[in-house]
Structure formats: structure tokens, C-alpha cells
From Swiss-Prot:
Catalytic activity, EC: 3.1.-.-
Identification of the protein by name: Endoribonuclease ToxN
Function: Toxic component of a type III toxin-antitoxin (TA) system. An endoribonuclease which cleaves between the first and second A of AAAAA sequences; it tolerates other nucleotides in positions +2 and +4 of the consensus. Digests cognate antitoxin RNA ToxI as shown by the 2'-3'-cyclic phosphate at the 3' end of the 34-nt repeats and probably other RNAs. Inhibits growth when expressed in E.coli without causing cell lysis; this bacteriostatic effect is neutralized by cognate RNA antitoxin ToxI, which has 2.9 nearly identical 34 nucleotide-long repeats.
Effect ascribed to mutating S57A: Overexpression no longer inhibits growth in E.coli
Lineage: Bacteria, Bacillati, Bacillota, Bacilli, Bacillales
Compositional bias segments (type: Basic and acidic residues): 171-182
Amino acid sequence: MTNKDNPKFHTISTEYIDYLREADSKVPFNKDEQHSRPYVGVLEKINGHDYFVPLTSRNDKNFNSQVSVKLFDNDEKRIGVLLVNNMIPVPEKECKEIDIAEKTAADPQYGNLMLKQYLFLKENMDRVTNKVEKVYKDVTVQGKPSHKQKFLKGVCCDFPKLEEKCQEYKERDQAKERDKARRIAYMRQMGRER
């Protein structure tokens, strides 16, 4: 998980992304395998879940500042956008940390972009965390929502629904692990009886 002094990039398994997309079409697709969409881990659990915020390098689109954090290099050139509205809860087993040095060795241009994004995030994680917490709170508010909250609910993933799906996925995965352990134990038992 990320800490304030060391933000980390992760990839999320396509299988898990596709699973969430069945429940909420606002969950962004993963990209190709060469440059799978990077996510930034949020500093602390939200409602008991580890949330990850997708990062895009697209600069040809205007992003609403209420639900995104724009990243800039030292020359004030936009180098990416965190899409807070599309953040998702992810089980630990479904995310993998990205090694920026490996990315740089494989694709220097992409690796250097990620390094610039990392440096920006390192200086601005408090701002990112505050935005994430505010958006989450506004989207999950109970009672009659304000105009802003209605807007946010319309452009953000359905966080409560995704949390349910995340929990179901974890439970399904645990059941698979138990079944696998039972099969292995059974096979060992059968081997001893021969």
C-alpha cells in the first residue's frame, strides 16, 4: 500500500476489472498488456477497502476538477490525470506494484513519464487523499443529496456497489482456495491409501 512519502503505481488484474465492470460500466477498461492502466494506491482504507485511483496520460480532454487531480511536471506541462471518480476497491491479490525502473528499461519514454508522475504525486499526496475522501463522502452520502452530490453520483463509480462486489470476489476467491486445499488433501490421502 502507498504511504505519503512513497506513492506507488499498481496494475489491477483484467479479470477483476472485468468482474467490476459487470456491476458498474463506469469502471475503466484496462489497457493493453504492454502499458496496462496504472493505478495509484490510496493512503488509507476507505470503508474497510483498499481503493486505487486510475491514472491516465491523456491530455487531449478536459477533466472536471471536482473528480480529478491533474499532474504537472516542473515546466507546468500536464503529464497525467488521476480519475478520482473512477477509483475502485481492490483485493490485495488482484494488484501488482509497478517497478518504474523496469518500465524505464523496457520503454524509456513511458518510464520517464511515470517517474515525473511519481515525483508530482510524492509532493501532492495530501491533496490527492483529501480529494479522494471528499469525493467518496459526497457520493456515499445518505439522505437527500445536494445538486453537487447528484452530479458526483452521476459521474462517479457506484462505490457501495463496487465494495459489495469486491467483498463477493474475495469470498469467492477464498472458497476456491479452500476447495483447492481440500482437493490436495484428498489426493494426498488417496496416495497414502494405495
